[in-house]
UniProtKB/Swiss-Prot annotation:
Its main location: membrane. It comes from Pseudomonas paraeruginosa (strain DSM 24068 / PA7) (Pseudomonas aeruginosa (strain PA7)). Belongs to the major facilitator superfamily. YhhS family. This is Uncharacterized MFS-type transporter PSPA7_3302. It is found in: Cell inner membrane. It holds the Pfam family MFS_1. The chain crosses the membrane at residues 23-43, 52-72, 90-110, 121-141, 158-178, 180-200, 228-248, 255-275, 282-302, 309-329, 351-371, 375-395. One of its GO terms (cellular component) is plasma membrane.
Length: 402
């Protein structure tokens, strides 16, 4: 006797595919925006340190100042997203990305005058940071507005795939552009990408505005601060790899440092694709605890690596671990505010990763000056373990009655 097992209804399967397609069509703008961030990522520290002749602290600051600008722009970005809509925020962000490319072109033109070149570069990084504050959060808000709040974790996960995938692709692409065409090609590519993103966003239908009480930003910030602190501690590992992996490999006499950024991004994306639904099944705090533990192991591998291939494995493990930290804490944070304040909540929560990455450059550069480049990964590991301890505390608090 045989039993017929009914197949999954085509309508349900089609609905799932439709949700994913709608999300991907919006997080495409995050991919474009972060590609403009990834392209100069592996080149700028060496350019500032070797070509312009500045120290490791300034080399780190050139990367970190972008995140500081994003941090300062978050309140404004949240108001734009909630008040004018995510589409308008994406358009503003793409225009800013294109403008940042122009300042990078100026920096290359002034290469013979190091101070002027550095100043142009810093202004461009500030503009790019402000643009990032608009595009990243707006794409999440646009996606949630299109597919509904029950798919929040999925939207955040796909947005992360787009952002770190773009960084993983952009870093080696930037190196190749400089090798083939020269430094100017990075600025030109960023201008073109910003214009492309603007042109693609212009004809798309906007998400409906959610009406309701608008909480003051500092109230929203207060609600999401514990979750944001966990994210910030986990992000130090990524910031350390992104800013100093090229200088760390050079200090050890190793080649192919850019592969670490690609390994980090590739494993980050793989974990997001494989385990994104785990947040809905297990809860954000449980996922954050596991992920921060894995990230800590990866950073320990980088600290103790005897050769570049072990270092590469450490970067890959760090990317795998960090992959779900943002959505794991993020889902718990966004649930603390009304839907009409979703943009502000995303902006306030994301502010902590900006703060972390903004501080990481000069702080880790200072640690490197005192103890050598190898020590920075032990420092990042201790930060990730602190984030793990915070996630455990938040999880225990969430289970208390009342």
């Amino acid at each position: 006797m045989s039993v017929d097992i009914p197949p999954i209804p085509p309508a349900q399967d089609s609905a799932r595919q439709n949700v994913t397609l709608q999300i991907v069509s919006v997080v495409l703008f995050t991919f474009i925006g972060y590609l403009t961030i990834g392209i100069p990522l592996a080149v700028l520290p060496g350019y500032v340190h070797d070509d312009l002749g500045y120290g490791s602290v300034l080399a780190g600051l050139v990367i970190s100042v972008q995140y500081l600008a994003t941090l300062l722009a978050r309140p404004y970005a949240g108001r734009v997203i909630d008040g004018l809509g995510p589409k308008r925020a994406v358009l503003y962000g793409m225009a800013g990305s294109a403008a940042s490319g122009l300042f990078m072109l100026l920096s290359v033109a002034f290469q013979g005058w190091p101070a002027l070149s550095l100043a142009s570069l810093l202004v461009g990084r500030l503009v790019l940071g402000a643009a990032e504050s608009l595009v990243g959060s707006a794409a999440i808000g646009w996606g949630i507005g299109r597919v509904g709040a029950p798919h929040t974790a999925k939207v955040i996960s796909w947005n992360g795939i787009a952002s770190y995938g773009a960084i993983a692709l952009g870093a080696p692409l930037g190196v190749l552009l400089v090798q083939w065409l020269g430094l100017w090609s990075m600025g030109a590519a960023i201008v073109l990408l910003g214009l492309l993103g603007f042109a693609l966003a212009w004809p798309k239908l906007p998400a409906p505005l959610v009406h309701g009480e608008r909480l003051p930003f500092h109230h929203v910030l207060g609600r999401v601060t514990p979750h944001g602190m966990g994210l910030a501690l986990g992000a130090i590992g990524f910031g350390t790899i992104a800013t100093f992996i090229t200088l760390y490999y050079a200090s050890r006499g190793w080649a192919h440092a850019v592969l670490c950024l690609s390994a980090f991004g590739g494993c980050f994306i793989g974990a997001r694709l494989l385990f994104a639904n785990s947040i809905n099944r297990l809860g954000g705090f449980r996922v954050a605890i596991v992920c921060l533990g894995i990230e800590s192991l990866g950073l320990l591998l980088l600290w103790s690596a005897p050769n570049p291939w072990i270092g590469l494995a450490g970067a890959a493990l760090t990317g795998f671990g960090f992959s779900l930290v943002f959505p794991a804490f993020g889902v718990e944070a966004v649930n603390l505010v009304p839907a009409s304040n979703r943009g502000a909540a995303l902006g306030a929560y994301s502010l902590f990763v900006d703060l972390s990455l903004g501080v990481t450059g000069p702080l880790v550069g200072f640690v490197a000056n005192l103890f050598g480049f190898r020590s920075i990964f032990l420092f990042a590991c201790l930060a990730a373990l602190s984030g793990l301890a915070l996630a455990v505390a938040l999880h225990r608090r969430s289970r208390r009655p009342g």
